[in-house]
Amino acid sequence: MSKFRTIFITIFQGVEAKNILRTDIFKELISHADIRIVFFVRTREKEDFYQKQFGHPRVFYEVVSRIDQGFWQSFFGSLKFKLINTATIDWRRRLAFEIHKSRFRFCVGWLLNRLLAHRFVRKICRSLDMLLVKDSTFAVFFDKYRPAAVISAHPFDDIEASLLKEAKRRKIKTFGLANSWDKITGRCALRVLPDKLIVYNDLVKKDAIDYVDFPNGDIFVGGVPHYDQHINQPKLSRSSFLEHIGGDP
């Protein structure tokens, strides 16, 4: 039995790393001597980059550049964009029409969206997604580290959906972070619902209830992580700032 509680955290995208590594989230987690963190990145270059800045005896980096592809993986990866109906989604469809000038594509997209963007359809799709998509990309890491929890810092991405599925199969606690104020209404449905969702504010919480189908009690309003520095960190004087950037005082 390991003496550590291991947490998987995704930093596949820059905004994820900003929200986790460059805020007090990382500092707070690593301050607990019994916590071990495994960060998932897309490339060896990113692994080296973060290792140099955030290296620690209890921090590990694993590279996952892609997930297993197949018909059902591609099918549900495409279908998720048809499963929510918002003004932003309609605007993006109109913008695509202006670019491609395809009336057929516009009409089919509009019709599918209106037919499929319902809570009960999303629930069915998530169940079928779990059943039909066979992807064991992350299994080796679960066997290796035996995590106690998984944090997906961008659960809308397919590679992170794959990680969440593996955790769900193993009955491991999962957390998701909606890392932008407009991610829920402007992108797509979640293929996998984490056990808990962290959002920036009450407006995003309402969006998560309306469009992501999250129960009210499973959503935590945590604020914007990278804004904490404006309160917690000491302010530079004007002269110090100009000196820092090489400006003329």
Where are these regions (language model features)?
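A short, Lys/Arg-enriched amphipathic alpha-helix followed by its capping loop at the start of a domain
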Residues: 4, 24-35
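A short, glycine/small-residue-rich beta-strand->loop->alpha-helix junction that serves as a flexible
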Residues: 10-23, 152
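A nucleotide-sugar donor-handling region in carbohydrate enzymes
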Residues: 130, 193-249
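Helix N-cap/beta->alpha junction signal
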Residues: 13, 43, 154-156, 180, ...
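Conserved N-terminal ligand/cofactor-binding loop architecture of enzyme catalytic domains
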Residues: 10, 38-138, 144
